[in-house]
């Protein structure tokens, strides 16, 4: 698999041109463009596993992917968009499990989650129930990989079953504006795939909100990626998240980073909108006085569908809106309404996904 590195600048320029055109009706300032590294930038990778027999009758294993157009499978020995740690682990893992019936039988997928801090989680997915014998072999595998110098976690998954030998997460350390921020990242949960671009996003968001007054509300906070980085720019931060594992990670990350002004609530953005509007009462909000928060800034990082109408109406009531988008088309759709009351103070393109059409962007909106 070869990357068209020589085309990177032109591909990024095309993304910037298209995003500029989408935002043009809303009179934004000049687009800030943050370029990615051209290779080994991705911290996660997932591969199907192909089982074959060589000419002398030995079982062979391969990482494979599928061509998006032809749907044909192809073998992946090295994966140049993934960071060096994943590439090193890919070859080491297959070499270590080759010929081991307990570890390879009905293994159909391997997921890798790595960090800039040097940790990696390897999740092995099976079409069979995992027993104590598998666990013993997996523990021996972990020890052999650690002997090679890997800081590795091994997780086995099957239908309605998950076995983490030690833990099911890695700990990332991101240098943001001169401070190291610690983030627990759980396997099979959402994390930003391009860690160095994530740092640029966090620093951009911090620079937008640097002289803010009052409190911050964040919807869809995940493991606290943004809210932890932004907390020192505000008096208090209130954040919502629906995923139980993400909330648990966020609580851990808050403690590890010494944040004392950030409260996480486990509820959806839609539910929080109902609570704010007094439509419903929620037991999860007992002990939390929403009236004690003076949230005049709101941060949203919605899914590809953008903000639903009720949330959009709620967001529009805030003086300042920081909107991170993974879909520029739904961002532009949402801006049709938001631009009636707010102006774009800053706009940015973050090239999270080089060599693809995907565009991550951000706008900083101030009430007119």
Curated annotation (Swiss-Prot):
Transmembrane segments: none annotated. S-adenosyl-L-methionine binds at residues 192, 220, 225, 241, 301. It comes from the Bacteria. Its EC number is 2.1.1.-, 2.1.1.35. One of its GO terms (molecular function) is tRNA binding. Keywords: Methyltransferase, S-adenosyl-L-methionine, Transferase, tRNA processing. Pfam families: tRNA_U5-meth_tr. GO terms for biological process: tRNA methylation. The keyword Plastid does not apply. It catalyses: uridine(54) in tRNA + S-adenosyl-L-methionine = 5-methyluridine(54) in tRNA + S-adenosyl-L-homocysteine + H(+); uridine(341) in tmRNA + S-adenosyl-L-methionine = 5-methyluridine(341) in tmRNA + S-adenosyl-L-homocysteine + H(+). The active site is at residues 326, 360. SUPFAM superfamilies: S-adenosyl-L-methionine-dependent methyltransferases. It is an enzyme of class 2 (transferase). InterPro entries: MeTrfase_TrmA_AS, MeTrfase_TrmA_CS, SAM-dependent_MTases_sf, TrmA_MeTrfase, U5_MeTrfase_fam. Belongs to the class I-like SAM-binding methyltransferase superfamily. RNA M5U methyltransferase family. TrmA subfamily. Dual-specificity methyltransferase that catalyzes the formation of 5-methyluridine at position 54 (m5U54) in all tRNAs, and that of position 341 (m5U341) in tmRNA (transfer-mRNA). PANTHER family: TRNA/TMRNA (URACIL-C(5))-METHYLTRANSFERASE, TRNA_TMRNA (URACIL-C(5))-METHYLTRANSFERASE. This is tRNA/tmRNA (uracil-C(5))-methyltransferase.
């Amino acid at each position: 698999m070869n990357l068209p590195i020589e085309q990177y600048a032109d591909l990024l320029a095309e993304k910037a041109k298209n995003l500029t055109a989408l935002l043009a009706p809303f009179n934004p300032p000049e687009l800030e463009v943050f370029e990615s590294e051209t290779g080994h930038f991705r911290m996660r990778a997932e591969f199907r596993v192909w089982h074959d027999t060589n000419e002398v009758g030995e079982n062979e294993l391969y990482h494979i992917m599928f061509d998006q157009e032809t749907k044909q499978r192809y073998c992946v020995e090295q994966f140049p968009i993934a960071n060096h740690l994943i590439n090193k682990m890919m070859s080491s893992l297959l070499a270590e499990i080759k010929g081991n019936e307990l570890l390879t039988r009905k293994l159909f997928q391997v997921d890798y989650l790595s960090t800039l801090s040097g940790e990696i989680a390897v999740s092995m997915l099976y079409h069979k129930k995992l027993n104590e014998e598998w666990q013993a072999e997996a523990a021996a595998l972990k020890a052999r990989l650690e002997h090679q110098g890997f800081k590795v976690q091994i997780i086995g998954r099957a239908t309605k079953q998950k076995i983490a030998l030690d833990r099911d997460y890695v700990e990332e350390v991101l240098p943001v504006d001169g401070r190291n921020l610690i983030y627990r990242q759980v396997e099979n949960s959402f994390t930003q795939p391009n860690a160095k671009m994530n740092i640029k996003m966090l620093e951009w968001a911090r620079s937008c909100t640097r002289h803010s007054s009052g409190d911050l509300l964040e919807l869809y906070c995940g493991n606290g990626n943004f809210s932890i980085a932004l907390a020192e720019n505000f008096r208090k931060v209130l954040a919502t998240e629906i995923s139980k594992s993400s909330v648990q990670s966020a609580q851990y990350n808050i403690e590890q980073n010494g944040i004392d002004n950030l409260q996480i609530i486990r509820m959806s953005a839609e539910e929080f909108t109902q609570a704010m509007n007094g439509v419903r009462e929620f037991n999860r909000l007992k002990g939390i006085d929403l009236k004690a928060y003076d949230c005049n800034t709101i941060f949203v990082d919605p899914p590809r569908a953008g903000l639903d109408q009720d949330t959009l109406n709620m967001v529009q009531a805030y003086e300042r809106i920081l909107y991170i988008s993974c879909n520029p088309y739904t961002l532009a759709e949402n801006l049709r309404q938001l631009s009636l009351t707010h102006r774009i103070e800053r706009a940015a393109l973050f090239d999270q996904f080089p060599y693809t059409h995907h565009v991550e962007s951000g706008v900083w909106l101030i009430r007119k």
